[in-house]
Amino acid sequence: MSLCQFVSSISDCRITQALIYGVLFVGVYKITTFTLSVGSLLVDLFVLPAVDFKKYGAKQGKWAVVTGASDGIGKEYAYQLASRGLNVVLISRTLSKLELIATEIETKYKVSTEVIAFDASTDNDANYAKILHTVSNLPVTVLVNNVGQSHSIPVPFLETEDKELRDIITINNTVTLKITQAVAPVIADTVAKENKKVKGLILTMGSFGGLLPTPYLATYSGSKSFLQAWSSALAGELKPQGIDVQLVISYLVTSAMSKIRRSSASIPNPKNFVTSVLNTAGRRCGAQERFATTTPYWTHALMHFGIENTVGVYSKFANSLNFSMHKSIRVRALKKAARANATKTD
C-alpha cells in the first residue's frame, strides 16, 4: 500500500467514525428530548396539584376580566374565577344576561362584579373606551380573551360571505388585540404596585382549527393561527413585567359555537374544560413543543402531542383528513337545512 493510500484510508475511517458518532448523538438527543416531553406532559396533566390562584391575587381583592362572558365557556370562566376568590368584570353583548350572571356570582361567591355590554362585531373606539373607563381604577390581574366566532357551517373560502369573513377577523383578532391593549397596562400596573408579590395572567382562547390548517374553515383557521404567533410574542414582551401569557388550545367543547350538546371523553362540557384550564395555568400540558401555549384538557392534550410528534400539524396527511371531515360536515349541514326548508314549505 502506498503512503497516499494509507493516509486516504485513515482519513476515510475518521470521516466514517465522525458520521456514526454524529448520528448516534442526534439519535440520543431526539430520544432524550422526546422522553422528557412525554414525562412533562404526564406530570402536567396527572401529577402536579391544581394551580393556586393566590399567585394571581385571588382572595386579595383583585379582579379578572372575561370577554364573551354571557354563555358557554366564557360564563364558566366567570363562575370559576369567582369561585377562586377573584372579583369579575363581565363583558358580552347582551346586558340582561350579564346582569343575571353577575347577580348569581355575587350571591353564590360573595365577590364583586362589573358588567359591560359590548358588541364585538363592531370595531368601535367608544366600546374600548368604555372598557378602559371601567377597569382603569380596578386592581385587575387576570384577562380571559374568550370572545370568538366561527363559520355558521364549513364553507369554501371563495364562497364565504363578506359579513361572516369580516366578523370573524374583527371578533377573533381586532377585538382581542384592542381589549388586551386596554387591559394589559392595568394588569402591569397592579403587579408593579404589589412589587410583583402577585402575578398577572392573560389567557386567549385558541383552537385545533388554528393548530391545524383547516379547509372549509379557512378564515376561522387563519384567525386562530394568528393568535398563536401574537400570544407567544406578547408572552415574551410581558414576562419581565410579571405577567403570564398563554394561548389555550382546545378541540371541541359542548357550546353554542360548536353546536354540540352531548359531552364525551374527547368533547368536554364548559365546566370540565375550564377547570382543566385554570388548574394547569402556566403549564404546557399537550403543547410541549410550543412556548406560552397550553392544551389543558387531557384528551385534547394527548391528541395535540400525538399529532405534533407523528404526522405534524402542517402535513399533507393532516390537511387531507381535515378536508374530508369538514367537507362531510358541510354536506350533512346543507342536507339538514334543505330538510328544514322543505318542512317549512309544507
Curated annotation (Swiss-Prot):
MF-aspect GO terms: ketoreductase activity; very-long-chain 3-oxoacyl-CoA reductase activity
Compartment list: Endoplasmic reticulum membrane
Alphabetical GO biological process terms: fatty acid elongation; sphingolipid biosynthetic process; very long-chain fatty acid biosynthetic process
EC number assigned by the record: 1.1.1.330
Substrates-to-products reaction catalysed: a very-long-chain (3R)-3-hydroxyacyl-CoA + NADP(+) = a very-long-chain 3-oxoacyl-CoA + NADPH + H(+)
Predominant cellular place of this UniProt entry's protein: endoplasmic reticulum
Signal peptide: none
Protein name: Very-long-chain 3-oxoacyl-CoA reductase
